[in-house]
Amino acid sequence: MGGSVDGDVGGPTNAGGQLPSARARAEEIARSLYPHQVEGLAFLLGRRRSILADDMGLGKTRQSVLAMVEAEPTGPYLVICPATVKGNWVREILIVLPDAETTIVGPARTPTADFSGWVIINYDLLKREVDALLQHRWSGLVFDEAHYLKNHRTIRNRLSMRLVAETGSPVVHALTGTPLTNRPRDLFPLLQLVDHALGKSFLSFAKRYCHAHKNDYGYWVTTGASNIEELSVQLHGIMLRRTKANVLDLPLKMRSWIDVVVPQHVVERLNDA
C-alpha cells in the first residue's frame, strides 16, 4: 500500500485549543505514570479534541481520565465504550480519582436526571438514552474503542456525532488501539468526532486518501489508500499512536482481572461440562 501512518503520530502542532505548558503540567500531575503516558497526557492536554491510538495495553484510559479532569476540573463526563470494558473504566477512574462518582448505564434504565461525575454507557444503549444524554452539558466526551464508529453511515455513528454537536462538550477524546490507517476510510468518522478539517466531506477525503473511483456500475469504491505520507502529516497534530515496539519503558508483563457477567444458562453449561 506504500507508506503507512501507523507509527509514532503526533507532535507539538496545535490542532484546536492549545493549553499552556502542557508538557510541564503533565509531568507535574503524572509522576506515577510511565514516560510514554506522560507524553500522551501532554498530547491530550495540548489540544481540546484529539485521537489517542496507542496499542492495547499502553494505558489510554488512564491518560484520558487525567487529561480530562485537568482540562475540565468540573464534570460531568461521559464515556461511551463497548459493554465489556465499562467495569474497567470504573476501576481506572477510581485508581486516579478515588473520590470520583461513577455511574454505569446498563440494560435497566438509570435515572438520567441524577447523572453527575463520570457516566459510562455502551454504544448499544445510545439509541435508548440519547435524548436524556443530550439534556446534559458534558464537560468532556470520551469515545473508547472508537473504531466501533468506523462506518460513518451507522446509527451508532450518527448518535455519537449528535452528542458531540449538540452538547457543546469542550473536550473530546477518541481512543482506539486498532490501527485504522491501513484503510483510511475508517479514519474519517474519528476525524469528524474531533472536528478536523479532513472530516468535513467524505467524498473529498476519499478522493484524496482512499483512491476513490467509480466501478463499472457507477458506484464509488473507497476501500483503497492513496497519498498516505500526506495523510500522516495532516494527522500529526490531532492523532498520537505508539506501538509496544515504540515504547521501551514497559514492564515485561502485567496481568489484570476483568469482571464479566455470565448468563445463568452459560454457568449451568460450564458446571455440567
What are these regions (language model features)?
Residues V85-A108, V194-L198:
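Conserved helix-turn-beta segment of the N-terminal RecA-like "Helicase ATP-binding" lobe
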Residues G57, D124-K127, H147-K150, P179:
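Catalytic acidic motif of RecA-like/P-loop NTPases
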Residues R109-S139:
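Conserved helix/coil segment N-terminal to the catalytic DExD/H
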Residues T74-I95, R183-D186:
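Conserved Walker A/P-loop ATP-binding site and its immediately adjacent core
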